[in-house]
From Swiss-Prot:
GO MF annotations, alphabetized: transmembrane transporter activity
Membrane topology: Multi-pass membrane protein
Protein name: Uncharacterized MFS-type transporter MJ1560
Family, similarity comment: Belongs to the major facilitator superfamily.
Chief place of localization: membrane
Amino acid sequence: MGKLEKNVFVIWITTFTTMLGVGFIAPIMAIYAQTLGATNLEIGLIFGSFALARTVAQIPVGVLSDIYGKKFFIVCGTFFYGVSTLMYNFVSTVLGFLIVRIFTGIFSAFVTPVAGSYIAAIAPKTRLGEYMGIFNSAITLGFGIGPFIGGILADMYGIKMPFYFCGFLGILAAIISYMKLEDIVFNKNKEKIDVKKISTLFSFEFLKNRNFSSSFIINVSNVMINAGIYAYLALYAINYNITISQVGFMIALTNILMALLQRSFGKLYDKLGNIMIIIGIFIISFGMYLLSTSTTFLTILASLTIIAVGSSISSTATTSLAVKDIPTHRKGEAMGLFTTSINIGMFIGAVSFGFLADILGIANMYKFSAIFSIVVGIISYLRIER
């Protein structure tokens, strides 16, 4: 195994291990918050605080990782994410839970954006799509199978056990990256960093780049669609006598499918280029329309499978396009900003599509999502520089 492959493998293992832990606690967060006396509004604040903290932190973290090295932030992020996750088991109030949630959001910003920029920096430019597909598969696969394992742990050993396992996996990921990962630093003259340079930590100048901004908007749209699916799929499926365990199976299966497909679609992007983005968007929209008309386990599963294929195509292509023309020494900053599209999409999608579901019903909300995806996708695609 060469040096490039070794570093990619270490990043993949570190990211997968961390996201596996995140998946462990995903099914039980709301239940655990309720045992502390949290209302539905407070549960919403708890979930939202993670995305908000992550969004605020990941842009400056991306810039600082370019200056001071990727390894430091990946090691610190995974370690303190693990430690802060362990603290869930020792909180006794909703406020304490909220504070811990904020810290886990901050430290999660040290991991995936920095790891993604690490891959973008070391990957050969002609194989960027392939390597970003490999990286994205670690996120999707880890979070895909994590909820199943976390649910089993909670049923067998109590609701606190997944938090212990998640914390352990975070610390394990820190140890792996500390021992095996090679550091990369782009600015070794740290003493020359001045106030003007620090002021660029929150720079949004990348959004002036049409390719970056188009990728950003498309990714927000795609994540909004996925947020609408995952937030309301169980409510939709229960109307057709589909059990929660079957819903969990469908989500896990589609996530694993996405993980398996992303590298191959990354290679296709390297060959075919930006046309892959619009192909993925049309497939997503077709799957969303089918989902809105599905009334059985098999038809819903088929719809989600189609959406997963489209998402695999589109997500790998948009991520690759976003960082393709960014200077190597600023890919961390760009990746940090680009990854905020995930948090923005999750928040806006869950809230806005929930509002529409109350007015139109969940099935019609899914139909609206299909139209929304196509309209936003086409407009953004036409803005991409040829």
